[in-house]
Regions:
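His/acidic/aromatic-lined binding-pocket segments of jelly-roll/cupin-type domains
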Residues: 82, 90-92, 124, 130, ...
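A short beta-loop-beta micro-motif enriched in histidine and acidic residues
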Residues: 30-32, 76-77, 87, 126, ...
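Acidic, glycine-rich loop-and-beta core segments that form the ion-binding/anion-interacting portion
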Residues: 205-273
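Conserved short histidine dyad/triad with adjacent acidic residue
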Residues: 311-314, 326-343, 361, 368-369
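Ligand-binding loop in jelly-roll beta-barrel domains
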Residues: 84-89, 96-99, 126-130, 136-139, ...
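C-terminal, non-catalytic macromolecule-binding modules
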Residues: 265-317
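A short beta-strand-loop-beta hairpin characteristic of the jelly-roll/cupin
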Residues: 47-48, 59-67, 231-247, 341-342, ...
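Transition-metal
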Residues: 1-211, 284-302, 327
Length: 396
Protein backbone atom coordinates (compact mmCIF):
# COMPACT_ATOMS: atom_id res chain seq x y z
CA UNK A 1 0.00 0.00 0.00
CA UNK A 2 1.18 3.50 -0.80
CA UNK A 3 -0.17 6.60 0.93
CA UNK A 4 -1.27 9.33 -1.45
CA UNK A 5 -1.29 13.11 -1.23
CA UNK A 6 -3.79 14.53 -3.74
CA UNK A 7 -3.02 17.08 -6.41
CA UNK A 8 -4.90 20.29 -5.61
CA UNK A 9 -6.87 22.01 -8.37
CA UNK A 10 -7.67 25.65 -7.58
CA UNK A 11 -10.38 26.34 -10.15
CA UNK A 12 -12.28 29.55 -9.42
CA UNK A 13 -15.63 27.81 -8.90
CA UNK A 14 -14.35 25.74 -5.97
CA UNK A 15 -15.21 26.05 -2.31
CA UNK A 16 -12.44 27.35 -0.07
CA UNK A 17 -13.49 25.21 2.89
CA UNK A 18 -15.27 21.95 1.96
CA UNK A 19 -12.27 19.87 0.88
CA UNK A 20 -9.89 21.29 3.53
CA UNK A 21 -12.48 20.43 6.20
CA UNK A 22 -12.68 16.82 5.00
CA UNK A 23 -8.90 16.54 4.78
CA UNK A 24 -8.31 18.22 8.13
CA UNK A 25 -6.42 21.12 6.55
CA UNK A 26 -6.56 24.84 7.27
CA UNK A 27 -8.73 27.00 5.02
CA UNK A 28 -6.21 29.31 3.34
CA UNK A 29 -8.90 31.37 1.60
CA UNK A 30 -8.09 30.05 -1.88
CA UNK A 31 -10.43 27.78 -3.83
CA UNK A 32 -9.88 24.07 -3.48
CA UNK A 33 -12.15 22.86 -6.26
CA UNK A 34 -10.86 19.33 -6.69
CA UNK A 35 -8.41 16.92 -5.08
CA UNK A 36 -7.06 14.39 -7.58
CA UNK A 37 -6.07 10.89 -6.50
CA UNK A 38 -4.66 9.28 -9.61
CA UNK A 39 -1.88 9.23 -12.16
CA UNK A 40 -3.18 11.64 -14.83
CA UNK A 41 -0.30 13.88 -16.01
CA UNK A 42 -2.37 17.02 -15.39
CA UNK A 43 -2.32 16.29 -11.66
CA UNK A 44 -0.71 13.06 -10.44
CA UNK A 45 -1.03 12.26 -6.75
CA UNK A 46 2.12 12.40 -4.65
CA UNK A 47 3.31 9.18 -3.03
CA UNK A 48 4.34 9.51 0.62
CA UNK A 49 7.64 7.68 0.03
CA UNK A 50 8.51 10.16 -2.72
CA UNK A 51 7.66 10.83 -6.34
CA UNK A 52 4.24 10.65 -7.94
CA UNK A 53 1.87 7.75 -8.58
CA UNK A 54 2.43 7.76 -12.33
CA UNK A 55 6.19 7.21 -11.82
CA UNK A 56 5.52 4.40 -9.39
CA UNK A 57 3.26 2.63 -11.90
CA UNK A 58 5.68 3.24 -14.78
CA UNK A 59 8.44 1.52 -12.81
CA UNK A 60 6.46 -1.66 -12.06
CA UNK A 61 3.35 -1.84 -14.28
CA UNK A 62 2.98 -5.64 -14.26
CA UNK A 63 3.07 -5.84 -10.48
CA UNK A 64 0.93 -2.80 -9.71
CA UNK A 65 -1.59 -2.92 -12.57
CA UNK A 66 -1.64 -6.61 -13.43
CA UNK A 67 -1.53 -8.27 -16.84
CA UNK A 68 -5.32 -8.07 -17.31
CA UNK A 69 -5.42 -4.28 -16.85
CA UNK A 70 -2.40 -3.78 -19.11
CA UNK A 71 -4.01 -5.91 -21.83
CA UNK A 72 -7.29 -3.95 -21.58
CA UNK A 73 -6.05 -0.40 -21.02
CA UNK A 74 -2.33 -0.27 -21.60
CA UNK A 75 0.34 0.50 -19.03
CA UNK A 76 -1.66 3.16 -17.20
CA UNK A 77 -4.20 3.44 -14.38
CA UNK A 78 -7.57 3.54 -16.19
CA UNK A 79 -9.46 5.62 -13.63
CA UNK A 80 -9.12 8.87 -11.69
CA UNK A 81 -10.63 9.43 -8.24
CA UNK A 82 -11.40 12.96 -7.08
CA UNK A 83 -12.98 15.01 -4.38
CA UNK A 84 -15.04 17.78 -5.99
CA UNK A 85 -16.47 20.82 -4.20
CA UNK A 86 -18.28 23.36 -6.39
CA UNK A 87 -19.36 26.55 -4.64
CA UNK A 88 -20.35 28.19 -7.93
CA UNK A 89 -21.74 26.53 -11.07
CA UNK A 90 -19.21 24.76 -13.26
CA UNK A 91 -19.11 25.36 -16.99
CA UNK A 92 -21.83 23.97 -19.23
CA UNK A 93 -19.83 21.07 -20.62
CA UNK A 94 -19.68 17.71 -22.32
CA UNK A 95 -17.06 14.97 -22.50
CA UNK A 96 -16.11 13.20 -25.73
CA UNK A 97 -16.40 9.53 -26.63
CA UNK A 98 -13.29 7.40 -27.03
CA UNK A 99 -13.29 7.83 -30.82
CA UNK A 100 -13.90 11.59 -30.61
CA UNK A 101 -11.10 12.04 -28.07
CA UNK A 102 -8.59 10.08 -30.13
CA UNK A 103 -9.45 11.97 -33.33
CA UNK A 104 -9.53 15.38 -31.64
CA UNK A 105 -6.21 14.81 -29.90
CA UNK A 106 -4.54 13.76 -33.15
CA UNK A 107 -5.90 16.76 -35.06
CA UNK A 108 -4.75 19.23 -32.40
CA UNK A 109 -1.33 17.59 -32.29
CA UNK A 110 -1.12 17.86 -36.07
CA UNK A 111 -2.07 21.53 -35.84
CA UNK A 112 0.78 22.13 -33.39
CA UNK A 113 -1.39 23.19 -30.43
CA UNK A 114 0.61 22.66 -27.25
CA UNK A 115 -0.92 20.48 -24.55
CA UNK A 116 -0.82 23.36 -22.07
CA UNK A 117 -2.23 25.94 -24.49
CA UNK A 118 -5.46 27.48 -23.10
CA UNK A 119 -7.24 26.84 -26.42
CA UNK A 120 -6.42 23.13 -26.46
CA UNK A 121 -9.61 21.00 -26.23
CA UNK A 122 -8.13 17.51 -25.99
CA UNK A 123 -5.52 16.95 -23.29
CA UNK A 124 -5.38 13.18 -23.86
CA UNK A 125 -6.80 10.45 -26.11
CA UNK A 126 -9.28 9.03 -23.61
CA UNK A 127 -13.02 9.34 -23.12
CA UNK A 128 -14.30 10.73 -19.80
CA UNK A 129 -17.46 9.07 -18.50
CA UNK A 130 -17.81 9.91 -14.82
CA UNK A 131 -19.82 9.22 -11.69
CA UNK A 132 -20.22 11.47 -8.66
CA UNK A 133 -21.22 10.22 -5.20
CA UNK A 134 -22.64 12.91 -2.95
CA UNK A 135 -21.08 13.42 0.48
CA UNK A 136 -23.36 16.41 1.13
CA UNK A 137 -26.44 17.66 -0.71
CA UNK A 138 -25.22 18.01 -4.28
CA UNK A 139 -26.88 20.04 -7.06
CA UNK A 140 -26.37 19.61 -10.80
CA UNK A 141 -28.02 19.69 -14.20
CA UNK A 142 -27.44 16.71 -16.49
CA UNK A 143 -28.82 15.52 -19.81
CA UNK A 144 -31.70 16.90 -21.84
CA UNK A 145 -35.25 16.94 -20.56
CA UNK A 146 -38.10 15.66 -22.69
CA UNK A 147 -39.13 18.52 -25.02
CA UNK A 148 -42.61 18.69 -23.46
CA UNK A 149 -41.04 19.20 -20.02
CA UNK A 150 -38.82 21.97 -21.38
CA UNK A 151 -41.95 23.62 -22.82
CA UNK A 152 -43.60 23.40 -19.38
CA UNK A 153 -40.61 25.14 -17.79
CA UNK A 154 -40.82 27.90 -20.41
CA UNK A 155 -44.60 28.26 -20.08
CA UNK A 156 -45.83 31.65 -18.91
CA UNK A 157 -42.58 33.43 -19.71
CA UNK A 158 -43.10 36.36 -22.05
CA UNK A 159 -39.56 37.47 -22.87
CA UNK A 160 -38.65 37.25 -26.59
CA UNK A 161 -36.06 34.56 -25.91
CA UNK A 162 -38.49 32.37 -23.96
CA UNK A 163 -41.09 32.70 -26.70
CA UNK A 164 -38.57 31.69 -29.40
CA UNK A 165 -37.39 28.65 -27.47
CA UNK A 166 -40.95 27.57 -26.67
CA UNK A 167 -42.12 27.99 -30.26
CA UNK A 168 -39.32 25.84 -31.68
CA UNK A 169 -39.95 23.03 -29.19
CA UNK A 170 -43.69 23.05 -29.83
CA UNK A 171 -43.17 22.86 -33.60
CA UNK A 172 -40.56 20.12 -33.27
CA UNK A 173 -40.96 18.23 -29.95
CA UNK A 174 -38.15 15.79 -30.71
CA UNK A 175 -34.40 15.56 -30.17
CA UNK A 176 -34.02 17.60 -33.35
CA UNK A 177 -35.99 20.42 -31.77
CA UNK A 178 -33.78 20.20 -28.68
CA UNK A 179 -30.70 20.28 -30.90
CA UNK A 180 -31.95 23.37 -32.74
CA UNK A 181 -32.79 25.30 -29.57
CA UNK A 182 -29.57 24.33 -27.80
CA UNK A 183 -27.33 25.16 -30.75
CA UNK A 184 -29.18 28.44 -31.40
CA UNK A 185 -28.65 29.48 -27.77
CA UNK A 186 -24.92 28.70 -27.54
CA UNK A 187 -23.64 29.32 -31.10
CA UNK A 188 -21.89 32.64 -31.70
CA UNK A 189 -23.96 33.54 -34.78
CA UNK A 190 -27.36 32.98 -33.15
CA UNK A 191 -26.90 33.22 -29.40
CA UNK A 192 -29.08 35.70 -27.49
CA UNK A 193 -27.67 39.00 -26.32
CA UNK A 194 -26.84 39.58 -22.65
CA UNK A 195 -29.90 41.84 -22.50
CA UNK A 196 -32.14 39.01 -23.72
CA UNK A 197 -30.66 36.66 -21.13
CA UNK A 198 -31.17 39.27 -18.40
CA UNK A 199 -34.83 39.69 -19.40
CA UNK A 200 -35.33 35.93 -19.21
CA UNK A 201 -33.64 35.72 -15.81
CA UNK A 202 -35.74 38.60 -14.47
CA UNK A 203 -38.93 36.72 -15.35
CA UNK A 204 -37.68 33.48 -13.85
CA UNK A 205 -36.48 35.16 -10.64
CA UNK A 206 -39.86 36.88 -10.25
CA UNK A 207 -41.86 33.65 -10.50
CA UNK A 208 -39.40 31.88 -8.23
CA UNK A 209 -39.87 34.55 -5.56
CA UNK A 210 -43.64 34.43 -6.05
CA UNK A 211 -43.72 30.66 -5.63
CA UNK A 212 -45.36 30.12 -9.03
CA UNK A 213 -42.50 28.25 -10.68
CA UNK A 214 -43.30 25.01 -12.54
CA UNK A 215 -39.91 23.74 -11.33
CA UNK A 216 -38.38 25.32 -8.26
CA UNK A 217 -35.07 23.51 -8.81
CA UNK A 218 -34.74 24.73 -12.39
CA UNK A 219 -35.48 28.32 -11.45
CA UNK A 220 -33.16 28.18 -8.44
CA UNK A 221 -30.35 26.91 -10.68
CA UNK A 222 -30.97 29.70 -13.20
CA UNK A 223 -30.77 32.35 -10.48
CA UNK A 224 -27.48 30.89 -9.17
CA UNK A 225 -26.00 30.78 -12.66
CA UNK A 226 -27.07 34.36 -13.37
CA UNK A 227 -25.48 35.57 -10.13
CA UNK A 228 -22.13 34.12 -11.23
CA UNK A 229 -22.30 34.58 -15.02
CA UNK A 230 -24.80 37.37 -15.78
CA UNK A 231 -25.87 37.52 -19.41
CA UNK A 232 -24.30 34.15 -20.28
CA UNK A 233 -26.20 32.08 -22.90
CA UNK A 234 -25.53 28.95 -20.86
CA UNK A 235 -28.21 30.14 -18.45
CA UNK A 236 -30.89 29.72 -21.11
CA UNK A 237 -29.43 26.40 -22.23
CA UNK A 238 -29.75 25.07 -18.68
CA UNK A 239 -33.55 25.31 -19.00
CA UNK A 240 -33.34 22.35 -21.38
CA UNK A 241 -31.50 20.12 -18.88
CA UNK A 242 -32.65 17.81 -16.10
CA UNK A 243 -32.22 19.25 -12.60
CA UNK A 244 -30.53 16.80 -10.23
CA UNK A 245 -30.41 16.88 -6.44
CA UNK A 246 -28.36 14.18 -4.76
CA UNK A 247 -28.58 13.46 -1.06
CA UNK A 248 -25.53 11.98 0.72
CA UNK A 249 -24.97 8.45 -0.52
CA UNK A 250 -26.70 8.99 -3.87
CA UNK A 251 -24.85 8.88 -7.19
CA UNK A 252 -25.10 10.35 -10.69
CA UNK A 253 -23.50 8.82 -13.78
CA UNK A 254 -22.62 11.16 -16.65
CA UNK A 255 -21.87 9.36 -19.94
CA UNK A 256 -19.94 10.76 -22.87
CA UNK A 257 -22.07 13.23 -24.81
CA UNK A 258 -24.25 14.27 -21.85
CA UNK A 259 -24.41 18.05 -21.37
CA UNK A 260 -24.07 18.83 -17.68
CA UNK A 261 -22.93 21.30 -15.05
CA UNK A 262 -22.33 20.72 -11.35
CA UNK A 263 -23.64 23.56 -9.21
CA UNK A 264 -22.92 23.04 -5.50
CA UNK A 265 -22.01 20.47 -2.88
CA UNK A 266 -19.22 18.07 -1.95
CA UNK A 267 -18.77 14.70 -3.60
CA UNK A 268 -16.42 11.92 -4.55
CA UNK A 269 -16.02 11.60 -8.31
CA UNK A 270 -14.61 8.67 -10.26
CA UNK A 271 -14.02 8.75 -14.00
CA UNK A 272 -11.98 7.38 -16.83
CA UNK A 273 -8.52 8.89 -16.50
CA UNK A 274 -8.97 11.95 -18.71
CA UNK A 275 -9.10 15.73 -18.58
CA UNK A 276 -11.04 16.27 -21.83
CA UNK A 277 -13.72 18.93 -21.36
CA UNK A 278 -15.62 20.77 -24.12
CA UNK A 279 -17.41 23.89 -22.93
CA UNK A 280 -20.29 26.00 -24.25
CA UNK A 281 -20.88 28.55 -21.49
CA UNK A 282 -20.80 29.53 -17.81
CA UNK A 283 -17.03 29.88 -17.82
CA UNK A 284 -14.15 32.24 -18.48
CA UNK A 285 -12.14 29.33 -19.91
CA UNK A 286 -11.79 28.41 -23.57
CA UNK A 287 -15.10 27.74 -25.35
CA UNK A 288 -15.27 25.81 -28.62
CA UNK A 289 -18.98 25.61 -29.42
CA UNK A 290 -18.74 23.78 -32.78
CA UNK A 291 -16.54 21.06 -31.29
CA UNK A 292 -18.76 20.82 -28.23
CA UNK A 293 -21.92 20.50 -30.34
CA UNK A 294 -20.31 17.73 -32.39
CA UNK A 295 -19.92 15.66 -29.22
CA UNK A 296 -23.40 16.19 -27.75
CA UNK A 297 -26.01 13.43 -27.45
CA UNK A 298 -29.39 15.14 -27.95
CA UNK A 299 -31.57 12.19 -26.89
CA UNK A 300 -33.76 13.27 -23.97
CA UNK A 301 -33.60 10.91 -21.00
CA UNK A 302 -33.83 11.04 -17.20
CA UNK A 303 -30.53 11.37 -15.33
CA UNK A 304 -28.70 8.08 -14.75
CA UNK A 305 -28.70 7.54 -10.98
CA UNK A 306 -27.13 4.16 -10.19
CA UNK A 307 -28.78 2.39 -7.27
CA UNK A 308 -26.30 0.83 -4.84
CA UNK A 309 -25.96 -2.94 -4.91
CA UNK A 310 -25.16 -4.38 -1.50
CA UNK A 311 -22.30 -6.86 -1.77
CA UNK A 312 -22.31 -7.42 1.99
CA UNK A 313 -23.71 -5.81 5.09
CA UNK A 314 -20.78 -3.37 5.05
CA UNK A 315 -20.16 -2.71 1.34
CA UNK A 316 -22.34 -1.24 -1.36
CA UNK A 317 -21.27 -0.92 -4.99
CA UNK A 318 -22.23 1.69 -7.59
CA UNK A 319 -21.80 0.21 -11.04
CA UNK A 320 -21.48 2.28 -14.21
CA UNK A 321 -22.01 1.00 -17.77
CA UNK A 322 -18.31 1.42 -18.61
CA UNK A 323 -15.24 -0.78 -18.21
CA UNK A 324 -12.90 1.84 -16.74
CA UNK A 325 -14.14 2.04 -13.15
CA UNK A 326 -16.55 1.09 -10.42
CA UNK A 327 -17.15 2.71 -7.04
CA UNK A 328 -17.62 0.96 -3.70
CA UNK A 329 -18.40 2.30 -0.24
CA UNK A 330 -17.56 0.27 2.87
CA UNK A 331 -18.74 1.31 6.33
CA UNK A 332 -17.48 -0.54 9.40
CA UNK A 333 -17.93 -0.35 13.16
CA UNK A 334 -15.62 -1.79 15.79
CA UNK A 335 -18.01 -4.65 16.56
CA UNK A 336 -17.64 -5.93 12.99
CA UNK A 337 -14.06 -6.97 13.58
CA UNK A 338 -11.99 -7.45 10.44
CA UNK A 339 -14.00 -7.55 7.20
CA UNK A 340 -12.96 -8.22 3.60
CA UNK A 341 -13.09 -5.29 1.17
CA UNK A 342 -14.51 -6.47 -2.18
CA UNK A 343 -12.77 -5.58 -5.41
CA UNK A 344 -9.25 -6.00 -6.69
CA UNK A 345 -6.17 -3.97 -7.40
CA UNK A 346 -5.22 -1.61 -8.74
CA UNK A 347 -7.48 0.39 -6.44
CA UNK A 348 -7.51 3.66 -4.57
CA UNK A 349 -9.22 3.95 -1.20
CA UNK A 350 -10.16 7.21 0.52
CA UNK A 351 -11.41 7.47 4.10
CA UNK A 352 -14.30 9.94 4.18
CA UNK A 353 -15.37 9.42 7.79
CA UNK A 354 -13.87 8.09 11.01
CA UNK A 355 -10.67 6.05 11.17
CA UNK A 356 -10.07 2.61 9.69
CA UNK A 357 -7.18 0.19 9.37
CA UNK A 358 -6.50 -1.55 6.06
CA UNK A 359 -4.68 -4.88 6.09
CA UNK A 360 -3.11 -6.81 3.20
CA UNK A 361 -0.90 -9.91 3.22
CA UNK A 362 2.18 -7.73 3.64
CA UNK A 363 1.11 -4.40 5.11
CA UNK A 364 -1.19 -2.55 7.50
CA UNK A 365 -2.14 1.14 7.26
CA UNK A 366 -4.46 3.20 9.47
CA UNK A 367 -6.34 5.94 7.64
CA UNK A 368 -7.92 8.92 9.34
CA UNK A 369 -10.64 10.91 7.59
CA UNK A 370 -9.26 12.41 4.38
CA UNK A 371 -6.35 10.00 3.99
CA UNK A 372 -5.94 7.74 0.96
CA UNK A 373 -3.88 4.80 -0.27
CA UNK A 374 -3.12 3.07 -3.55
CA UNK A 375 -3.25 -0.73 -3.48
CA UNK A 376 -1.58 -2.58 -6.34
CA UNK A 377 -2.80 -5.65 -8.19
CA UNK A 378 -0.19 -7.78 -6.40
CA UNK A 379 -2.11 -7.34 -3.12
CA UNK A 380 -4.82 -9.88 -3.86
CA UNK A 381 -6.84 -9.54 -0.65
CA UNK A 382 -7.70 -6.53 1.47
CA UNK A 383 -9.37 -6.29 4.87
CA UNK A 384 -10.65 -3.38 6.96
CA UNK A 385 -11.42 -2.81 10.62
CA UNK A 386 -12.24 0.19 12.80
CA UNK A 387 -15.01 2.81 12.81
CA UNK A 388 -15.50 4.70 9.58
CA UNK A 389 -16.35 4.83 5.90
CA UNK A 390 -14.11 4.13 2.90
CA UNK A 391 -14.74 5.01 -0.72
CA UNK A 392 -12.94 2.78 -3.20
CA UNK A 393 -12.33 3.12 -6.94
CA UNK A 394 -11.25 0.05 -8.86
CA UNK A 395 -11.72 -1.67 -12.22
CA UNK A 396 -14.59 -4.13 -12.83
Amino acid sequence: MRRLEPARQQYSWGSTSAIPALLGRADDGSPWAEAWYGSHPAGPAQVAEGGVLSELIDAEPERLLGEDIIWRFGRRLPFLLKLIAPEQPLSLQVHPSQAQAAEGYALEDEAGIALDHPCRNYKDTNHKPEMVLALTRFQAVAGFRAPRRAVEVLAGLDSPLARRMRRTLRLNPTRYGIRQVFSDVVSSATRPSPQEIDALVTEIAARFEAGTSPSLRVDSNVVKMADTFPGDPGIAAALLLNPVTLQPGEALFVPAGSVHAYISGLGVEVMASSDNVLRAGLTAKHIDVPEMLACVDYVAAPPVRPAPEYLSRATRAYYAPVDDFELMVTTVVAADGRLPVPGRGPRILLAVEGAVTLVTQTDSQTLAQGEAVFVGADERSLFVEGEGTLVQADVP
